[in-house]
Regions:
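Metal- or metallocofactor-binding catalytic centers and their adjacent structured scaffolds
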Residues: 20-98
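Structured beta-strand/loop patches that form or line metal/cofactor-binding pockets in enzymes
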Residues: 1-28, 32
Length: 100
C-alpha cells in the first residue's frame, strides 16, 4: 500500500487524520494530546515523508517510526496512533470487513 494523500483537522484537542491510498481508499484515525494541536501538526508534517514510502505492515511502520524519532513524547504517540488507525481502516475497507 502507498499513501497518496494525507489530510488532517484539529478539532478542539483532537487530531483527525484521513489517509488515502493509491487506489483511492481512505481511512480515518484520531489522536489526542491535550490542547497542543499545533504540536501534532508539526509531528505529522515530519512523518509525511516516511508515509510516502510503500507500507507493507502497519505494525512494522508504527515501530519503525517510533524508534526513528528520539523525542518519544505523548504527542508523537498520539499522531502515530492516529496514523495506525487510519492504515488499519484502509486495510479493512480493502477487504470489505469491519474494523473493530
Amino acid at each position: 500500500m502507498k499513501i497518496s494523500k494525507i489530510e488532517h483537522w484539529i478539532v478542539d484537542k483532537w487530531m483527525i487524520i484521513r489517509l488515502t491510498n493509491e487506489n483511492g481508499v481512505s481511512g480515518l484515525g484520531e489522536g489526542n494530546f491535550w490542547s497542543y494541536g499545533n504540536v501534532m501538526t508539526t509531528i505529522l508534517d515530519q512523518l509525511s515523508e516516511d508515509l510516502s514510502n510503500p507500507i507493507y505492515s502497519p505494525d512494522y511502520l508504527f515501530n519503525q517510526l517510533y524508534r526513528k524519532y528520539s523525542f518519544r513524547s505523548p504527542a508523537l504517540t498520539a499522531v502515530l496512533s492516529a496514523i495506525d488507525m487510519a492504515i488499519w481502516d484502509i486495510k479493512a475497507k480493502e477487504v470489505n470487513l469491519p474494523l473493530w
